[in-house]
From Swiss-Prot:
Residues 1-10 have a biased composition (Basic and acidic residues). Its EC number is 3.1.3.78. This is Type 2 phosphatidylinositol 4,5-bisphosphate 4-phosphatase. It comes from Homo sapiens. It is a multi-pass membrane protein. A motif (CX5R motif) lies at residues 107-113. The gene is PIP4P2.
Length: 257
């Protein structure tokens, strides 16, 4: 019932003061925590927005990503944070892994470790049950567990790659430039010396046969074959010695027990 002559249907706040009124409800803040509600992973079926265009939440910043014309893709790129978000299941035998730097990686199901390719990260992710950061679950902080292996600086391109061998003095193929180099200088030095020694021995044997058996070779033509074999083996060994002497050497950055 109206009181003091005020109509009960009149507004509680007069028009003269309505411009100074601010809403009392707290503003809506989009949840950005990794524990926020996320859409089902690897599916292109997302709730459409008001205009009927399919959208999905970014798995990094939770912004809406427009899927119009992108439903045939496996991943889409967020226009806000520029990170990738999967909308389909990975190919057969593959799996998605999210690096702590938010880079979306794809690797084999059987992979135990994977290295982040970003120059400002270069993190080695152990895909064991402790450090598994899969897109099937909300991202959890990676535990600082040292992986087995070492990071090697390529002798050709200078890039760093993960080398999983537990012993030095072996050959390694750089995944960046696809060239082969020796990890450590002991192996090429040792093999170069060995091939030089064997090559010189074969050449000395060939010279000895040439000088010591000329008369015998005139009677038995097969003797020339032994000369040729000795010289040929010596030449091959010297060529291999040149190869090992000129091979590039890659040096490890850090070694993990």
């Amino acid at each position: 019932m109206a009181a003091d002559g005020v109509d009960e249907r009149s507004p509680l706040l007069s028009a003269s003061h309505s411009g100074n009124v601010t809403p009392t409800a707290p503003p809506y803040l989009q949840e950005s925590s990794p524990r926020a509600e996320l859409p089902p992973p690897y599916t292109a079926i997302a709730s459409p927005d008001a205009s009927g265009i399919p959208v999905i939440n970014c798995r990094v910043c939770q912004s809406l990503i427009n899927l119009d014309g992108k439903l045939h893709q496996h991943v889409v790129k967020c226009t806000v944070c520029n990170e990738a978000t999967p909308i389909k299941n990975p190919p057969t035998g593959k799996k998605y892994v999210r690096c702590p730097c938010n880079c979306l990686l794809i690797c084999k199901d059987t992979s135990r470790r994977i290295g982040c390719p970003r120059p400002n990260c270069r993190r080695i992710i152990n895909l064991g049950p402790v450090m598994l950061i899969s897109e099937e679950q909300p991202a959890q902080p990676a535990l600082p567990i040292q992986p087995e292996g070492t990071r090697v600086v390529c002798g050709h391109c200078g890039n760093t790659f993960l080398w999983m061998e537990l012993r030095f003095n072996t050959l390694a193929k750089c995944p960046h430039c696809k060239k082969i180099s020796s990890v450590g200088s002991a192996l090429p030095r040792r093999r170069c010396c060995a091939y030089i020694t064997i090559g010189m021995i074969c050449i000395f044997i060939g010279v000895g046969l040439t000088v010591g058996t000329p008369d015998f070779a005139r009677r038995f033509r097969a003797t020339y074959v032994s000369w040729a074999i000795a010289y040929l083996l010596g030449l091959i060994c010297l060529i291999r010695a040149c190869y090992w002497g000129a091979i590039r050497v890659s040096y490890p950055e850090h070694s993990f027990a």
